[in-house]
Amino acid sequence: MQWYIDKLPALEHVTPILSVCGDDCAVCPRFLARTEEELHETAVFWYNAGWRDHIVSNEEIRCTGCGCRPTCSFMLLPCTREHGVSACRECASFECDKVKDMYIRSDEKKKQCEKACESPEEFLMLYRAFYEKEKNLR
């Protein structure tokens, strides 16, 4: 995603915005994409990275952080609501089977994500966004 690569220098020192599952929204392309072109490129990347089984609409790829959708792919958002916490790490059941499954499912996509990237720098920022969940939740 060229638009994302162009933003990488500015993203290096941004303050993390952690999601329920430990993703860093501050460097997430879905969170950062604003134009129709950026959203479409992001949707194509999500397909190429194996995170979607087809290229979704710009509306579907757009994300403003946890709570912008009624659920999440890991089913953690409804779980945190049920437990009355704002993040998994605050829950008395942390690290439950849902969280452990999320770590596994997330890691399964790492190699395909790296292959979809246009540069090592792009992958490193996406790694920060999506593959430091355990570190971010502790």
Where are these regions (language model features)?
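Cysteine-centered metal-binding/redox modules
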Residues: 1-138
